[in-house]
């Protein structure tokens, strides 16, 4: 007796062939999903602006479509639905009164808030009752408020260190440091924290004195802090050493001059004394006795 899966008649089609045929029919009847795409205008949205979620390449033979808020399509997350043939718009539980759904499938928001950040799903229903979905993540940014700078000290002695911290109440921002109204050129003596909101200078030099600002920004706005003036004092020890070296050099130079002058004076006195002495008589050269008459 043959296996149960064997086909006793020549007209019988193997189950693998039926499965392949069903897969091909399903692929043939299913609407294409490659062109259903949602675009946001503007792409980066600031709090209080209007935003338009448009459907790119909307398929044909549609019966209706609906917009949902959230990662999944749930009845309680329906914003609004639209039936194409009857032009009937039906608001859902997630409708806030600021959304408008158009006959072309677009969703228009007015005066968006931070709470509008999240996923939005478009579900389209074809006339053959098949369903297709597309998702888009909307990010709403808040306008950046003015930050502030806190310094470990505003007057620092040369060769010391200072820590500058930028404070902001906004989240999702980037930090940039400004020195004398220009972007700070970070040197080997400077260290930035992971998010750049803390600047450490060690050791500090006279060239680091000036006005510092921090700038915070997000994709839709930016703001700078008030200037903070940093004063760098000279190192007293270094100044004392320099003064000591200078005074010592002057004393050594004065001593050398004194010794030279003294040596020169002694040589001059000896020369004058020699010139004032009478010449000494030579022995045996006195007056001869024979000359006396």
Swiss-Prot record:
Cellular localisation: Membrane
Residues spanning the signal sequence: 1-34
Main subcellular location of this protein, as a coarse class: membrane
Glycosylation sites: 111
Domain of life: Eukaryota
Topology, Extracellular side: 35-240
A Pfam family of this chain: Ig_3
Keyword Glycoprotein found: yes
Domain Ig-like C2-type, residue spans: 147-231
Membrane-crossing residue ranges in chain numbering: 241-261
One GO process term, biological-process aspect: T cell activation
Disulfide bonding pattern of the chain: 166-214
Family: Belongs to the immunoglobulin superfamily. CEA family.
Alphabetized PANTHER family for the sequence: CARCINOEMBRYONIC ANTIGEN-RELATED CELL ADHESION MOLECULE 1 (PTHR44427:SF1), CARCINOEMBRYONIC ANTIGEN-RELATED CELL ADHESION MOLECULE 19 (PTHR44427)
Protein name listed in UniProt: Cell adhesion molecule CEACAM21
Lineage start: Eukaryota, Metazoa, Chordata, Craniata, Vertebrata
């Amino acid at each position: 007796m043959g296996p149960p899966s064997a086909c006793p008649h020549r007209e019988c089609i193997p189950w693998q062939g039926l499965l392949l045929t069903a897969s091909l029919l399903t692929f043939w009847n299913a609407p294409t999903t490659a062109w259903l795409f949602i675009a946001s205008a503007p792409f980066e949205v600031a709090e209080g602006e209007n935003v338009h979620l448009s459907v790119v390449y909307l398929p044909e033979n549609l019966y209706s479509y609906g917009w949902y808020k959230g990662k999944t399509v749930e009845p309680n997350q329906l914003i609004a639905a639209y039936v194409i043939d009857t032009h009937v718009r039906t608001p859902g539980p997630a409708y806030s009164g600021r959304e408008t759904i158009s006959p072309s499938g677009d969703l228009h928001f007015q005066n968006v808030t931070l709470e509008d950040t999240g996923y939005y799903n478009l579900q389209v229903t074809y006339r053959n009752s098949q369903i297709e979905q597309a998702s888009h993540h909307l990010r709403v940014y808040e306008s950046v408020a003015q930050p502030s700078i806190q310094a470990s000290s505003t007057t620092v002695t040369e060769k010391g260190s200072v820590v500058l911290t930028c404070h902001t109440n906004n989240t999702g921002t980037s930090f940039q440091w400004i020195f004398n109204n220009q972007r700070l050129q970070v040197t080997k003596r400077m260290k930035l924290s992971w998010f750049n909101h803390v600047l450490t200078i060690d050791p500090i030099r006279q060239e680091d004195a000036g006005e510092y600002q921090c700038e915070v920004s997000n994709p839709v706005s930016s703001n700078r802090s008030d200037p903070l003036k940093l004063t760098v004092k000279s190192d007293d020890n270094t100044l004392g050493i320099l003064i000591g070296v200078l005074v010592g050099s002057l004393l050594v130079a004065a001593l050398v001059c004194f010794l030279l002058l003294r040596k020169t004076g002694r040589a001059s006195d000896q020369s004058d004394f020699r010139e004032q002495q009478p010449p000494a008589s030579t022995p045996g050269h006195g007056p001869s006795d024979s000359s006396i008459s």
